[in-house]
Amino acid sequence: MKPKVIRISTVPLSLHLLLQGQLKMLAETYEVLAVSSSGEELHKVAEREGVRTCAIPMERHIAPLKDLIALIRLIILFRKEKPQIVHSLTPKAGLLAMMAARICRVPIRIHTFTGLVFPSTTGWKQQLLIATDKLTCACATYLNPEGKGVRRDLERFHITSRALHLIGNGNINGIDLAYFDRTPEVMRQAEIYRRNPCFTFCFVGRLVRDKGINELVSAFVRLQQEFTNCRLCLVGDFEAELDPVTPETAEHIHKHPAIKFMGWQEDIRPFLAAADAFVFPSYREGFPNVILQ
């Protein structure tokens, strides 16, 4: 009988994008259960990775009552499944999963810090986020910062005195470098988006405040006034409820003739290949996949 491991994130998109291939590999040695909030991506994970999945509603923002309900559901799940390992990523799933796993006395409790929220906040919210990260660390048995910057902030803010295990130089999963080769097919698709001799800046990621989108758009609008032969390509979706951009930024994205909003794209290779420069003004990152891509 294989030992059981539960991998958990707040939203299914994290499992779908960040752990591609990893769950399938784990399933060769372990019985794997992937847990997150419900969504189409959770079904994709089950099919692609060949693992069981379970949907438990979790909120990314602070929601005390819903968080308590999610914690209780996780406790019930862990007692039913009796895993040997619970491994979480993303802040809210980390807090709830590590608490539930400790209550249920799961032997191995791992949390991967994929990026820290509190360094980009201030006041009472920062103190609350620091307290929740400290609680996550206290409940875990192993802590894995995604990158050197994350490890540095955990140490600088005295979040934990426990050992921090950085795998290699960081990153959560690595990427298939061959997949991002500039193959003839990728370059053929890139020609659809290329606008010679226009100079193209490209951003890939969530279009939210934390990713520096307000500053990026503002800087580009000013730049484009002086150098008209340039454009900005934005590949990703908004998160209006969780971390909205300013109304002025949103208006520029939708109406500025030199800003191309491409929305969510399953395959980002043609957009990267069509660009002259990649821009990534994020406030907080671990070791982001998109840089490797």
Residue ranges and their predicted role:
Residues 13-20, 65-72, 107-108, 117-139:
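Nucleotide-sugar donor phosphate/pyrophosphate-binding loop at the beta->alpha transition
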Residues 16-21, 199, 203-222:
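A conserved mid-protein helix/loop that constitutes part of the nucleotide-sugar donor-binding site
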Residues 7-66, 153-155, 163-166, 238-240:
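N-terminal strand-loop element at the rim of the active site
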Residues 73, 177-195, 200, 247-250:
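A short helix/loop element that forms part of the nucleotide-sugar donor recognition site in Leloir-type
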Residues 54-55, 134-186:
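Donor nucleotide-sugar binding/catalytic pocket of nucleotide-sugar-dependent glycosyltransferases
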Residues 264, 283:
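Aromatic "clamp/platform" in nucleotide-sugar-dependent glycosyltransferases that forms part
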Residues 43-47, 231-258, 262:
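Short, structured helix-loop element that forms part of the nucleotide-activated donor/catalytic region
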